[in-house]
């Protein structure tokens, strides 16, 4: 039984193929619940995100995982075979650690993937498809991810617009829990801004959007994290003073936040500072507002230069993180080998004791029937020696016949070292 990782990601498969083999939690839970009754493949975890679908399992071969993935999604194996990657044992462990650490992500170092892998493990545990051995691999991968994030800078620099705005707000205002944020337009970019700031723990989110339906949708997505208020687009100017942070991305051909509106808002705020972020092209905010005392204005180019610099820093940190992951993977593999050796040694010792007990019983019976004690003991020693060294002798003969001279030489030298050690006089 080996540990396998098999799947597709944004590098190996198109979004159309990834959509075909994606799982939602409910469907995956039902599939796993059925799978635990199959002896051939009942020990598995499935990680499914927008950028990857991967199966991690203890199995006899990778082909069974590939077939399961295809069958579960009602597609032909031939559609997958040229797009999947597969890793076994050491490589699979290293891959899992890289995934959990964000080193294999589309956005290098992104933190969400660790939570997604943890959720995948929890779902499999609930379905009872996780053995202690598989669980220990995942727990060590989480430990590796924690080390990578705490000891390297791979995840410490903003590399998306939404995250960059949130980090900027944290730099300008030291206490996010007191902030009121206004997002002007609720499109994809500002939705990410709103979600990042909500996760950061701001006090209130004001959504100003032309379409009430889209504003309601965004409000529902973040309402569990932050107090939300929706205002009409026509009420934008008169509500500006309420916002500590304003992020605008309307797609309008004309500016929607005028210099005079910001000046009035500052006066109403008693000149408390404002962070204004203009993510639109053409620009939404009159660039002259930057001249107002207390206003910090950032545009797309400002943020992009920060993101480019941060991404370069992440890539540099990723080199250090890769070294750490390889070291931790080696540690886990060594630990597993030692554990396996312990089991083998225990079985070998038990086997030897059984042989000894049988030979002892045979010798005692010979003595009971009047056998010469000296002859019985000599026969006992000879028979015991022959049976104990037989497996090692056979192993050495087979190694000599094999096409790997290095293994034979290693085994021969190792046995010689054992003999030399035993011959040393005891003090």
Curated annotation (Swiss-Prot):
Residues where NADP(+) binds: 185-190
Cite the entry's keywords alphabetically. Answer: NADP, Oxidoreductase, Porphyrin biosynthesis
Q: Which CDD domains match?
A: NAD_bind_Glutamyl_tRNA_reduct (cd05213)
Q: Record's Pfam families?
A: GlutR_dimer, GlutR_N, Shikimate_DH
Q: In which pathway does it act?
A: Porphyrin-containing compound metabolism; protoporphyrin-IX biosynthesis; 5-aminolevulinate from L-glutamyl-tRNA(Glu): step 1/2
Question: Secretion signal: which residues?
Answer: none
Q: Which residues bind substrate?
A: 49-52, 105, 110-112, 116
Q: Where is the active site?
A: 50 (nucleophile)
**What SUPFAM superfamilies has UniProt attached to this entry?**
Glutamyl tRNA-reductase catalytic, N-terminal domain, Glutamyl tRNA-reductase dimerization domain, NAD(P)-binding Rossmann-fold domains
User: Which Enzyme Commission number(s) are listed?
Assistant: 1.2.1.70
Q: Which GO terms describe its molecular function?
A: glutamyl-tRNA reductase activity; NADP binding
List the catalysed reactions.
Answer: (S)-4-amino-5-oxopentanoate + tRNA(Glu) + NADP(+) = L-glutamyl-tRNA(Glu) + NADPH + H(+)
Q: Where is this site: Important for activity?
A: 95
Query: Could you name the domain of life of the organism this protein comes from?
Result: Bacteria
Q: What does this protein do?
A: Catalyzes the NADPH-dependent reduction of glutamyl-tRNA(Glu) to glutamate 1-semialdehyde (GSA).
Additional notes on this entry:
During catalysis, the active site Cys acts as a nucleophile attacking the alpha-carbonyl group of tRNA-bound glutamate with the formation of a thioester intermediate between enzyme and glutamate, and the concomitant release of tRNA(Glu). The thioester intermediate is finally reduced by direct hydride transfer from NADPH, to form the product GSA.
Q: Record's NCBIfam families?
A: hemA
Concerning PANTHER family, the annotation shows: GLUTAMYL-TRNA REDUCTASE
- Domain comment in the entry: Possesses an unusual extended V-shaped dimeric structure with each monomer consisting of three distinct domains arranged along a curved 'spinal' alpha-helix. The N-terminal catalytic domain specifically recognizes the glutamate moiety of the substrate. The second domain is the NADPH-binding domain, and the third C-terminal domain is responsible for dimerization.
What this protein is called in its record is: Glutamyl-tRNA reductase
């Amino acid at each position: 039984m080996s540990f396998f990782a098999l799947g597709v990601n944004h590098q190996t498969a198109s979004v159309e193929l990834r959509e075909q083999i994606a799982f939602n939690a409910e469907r995956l839970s039902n599939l796993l619940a059925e799978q635990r009754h199959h002896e051939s493949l009942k020990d598995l975890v499935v990680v499914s995100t927008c950028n990857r679908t991967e199966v991690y399992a203890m199995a006899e071969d990778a082909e069974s995982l590939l077939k399961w993935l295809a069958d579960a999604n009602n597609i032909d194996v031939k559609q997958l075979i040229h797009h999947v990657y597969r890793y076994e044992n050491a490589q699979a462990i290293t891959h899992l650690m890289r995934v959990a650490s964000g080193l294999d992500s589309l956005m290098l170092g992104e933190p969400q993937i660790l939570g997604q892998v943890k959720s995948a493990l929890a779902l499999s545990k609930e379905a009872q498809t996780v053995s202690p051995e598989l669980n220990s691999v995942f727990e060590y991968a989480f430990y590796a991810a924690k080390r990578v994030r705490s000891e390297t800078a791979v995840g410490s620099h903003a590399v998306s617009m939404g995250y960059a705005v949130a980090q900027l707000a944290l730099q300008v205002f030291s206490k996010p829990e007191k902030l009121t944020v206004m997002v002007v337009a609720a499109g994809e970019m500002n939705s990410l801004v709103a979600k990042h700031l909500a996760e950061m723990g701001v006090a209130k989110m004001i959504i100003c959007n032309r379409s009430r339906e889209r504003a309601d949708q965004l409000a529902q997505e973040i309402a569990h994290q932050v107090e939300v208020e929706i205002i009409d687009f026509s009420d934008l100017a008169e509500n500006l003073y309420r916002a500590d942070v304003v992020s605008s991305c309307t797609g309008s051909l004309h500016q929607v936040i005028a210099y005079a509106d910001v000046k009035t808002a500052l006066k109403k705020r008693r000149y408390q500072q404002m962070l204004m972020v203009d993510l639109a092209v053409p620009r939404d905010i009159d660039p002259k507002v930057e001249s107002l005392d207390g206003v910090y204005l950032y545009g797309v180019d400002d943020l992009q230069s920060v993101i480019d610099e941060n991404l370069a820093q992440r890539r540099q940190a990723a080199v250090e993180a890769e070294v750490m992951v390889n070291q931790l993977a080696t540690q886990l593999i060594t630990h597993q080998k030692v554990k396996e050796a312990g089991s083998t040694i225990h079985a070998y010792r038990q086997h030897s004791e059984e042989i000894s007990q049988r030979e002892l019983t045979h010798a005692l019976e010979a003595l009971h029937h009047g056998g010469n004690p000296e002859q019985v003991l000599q026969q006992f020693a000879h028979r015991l020696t022959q049976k104990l060294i037989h497996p090692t002798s056979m192993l050495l003969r087979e190694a000599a016949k094999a096409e790997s001279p290095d293994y034979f030489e290693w085994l021969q030298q190792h046995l010689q070292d054992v003999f030399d050690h035993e011959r040393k006089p005891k003090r």
